[in-house]
Amino acid sequence: MFSINFLGLLPEAYAPFDPIVDVLPIIPLLFLLLAFVWQSSVRFR
């Protein structure tokens, strides 16, 4: 019972972090782009 009530409160508790959660899926793509930039810089050096 406690876990169900606790999960019910989570969305309200984490409401200020909604913009951060919206950005989180983009972070792996940034690392992928960083890998390409790093490889190109190493290749041309």
UniProtKB/Swiss-Prot annotation:
GO biological process: photosynthesis
Transmembrane region(s): 17-37
Propeptide segment residues: 1-8
Membrane-topology descriptor: Single-pass membrane protein
Cellular location(s): Plastid, Chloroplast thylakoid membrane
Record's keyword annotation contains Secreted: no
UniProt KW keywords: Chloroplast, Membrane, Photosynthesis, Photosystem II, Plastid, Reaction center, Thylakoid, Transmembrane, Transmembrane helix
Gene Ontology CC annotation, any one: chloroplast thylakoid membrane
Cysteines paired by S-S bonds: none
Family annotation (InterPro entries): PSII_PsbK, PSII_PsbK_sf
One protein family per Pfam: PsbK
Statement: the UniProt record of this protein carries the keyword Zinc-finger: no
NCBIfam families the UniProt entry points to: PRK02553.1
Subunit organization: PSII is composed of 1 copy each of membrane proteins PsbA, PsbB, PsbC, PsbD, PsbE, PsbF, PsbH, PsbI, PsbJ, PsbK, PsbL, PsbM, PsbT, PsbY, PsbZ, Psb30/Ycf12, at least 3 peripheral proteins of the oxygen-evolving complex and a large number of cofactors. It forms dimeric complexes.
Role description: One of the components of the core complex of photosystem II (PSII). PSII is a light-driven water:plastoquinone oxidoreductase that uses light energy to abstract electrons from H(2)O, generating O(2) and a proton gradient subsequently used for ATP formation. It consists of a core antenna complex that captures photons, and an electron transfer chain that converts photonic excitation into a charge separation.
Family named by the database record: Belongs to the PsbK family.
Name the UniProt record assigns to this protein: Photosystem II reaction center protein K
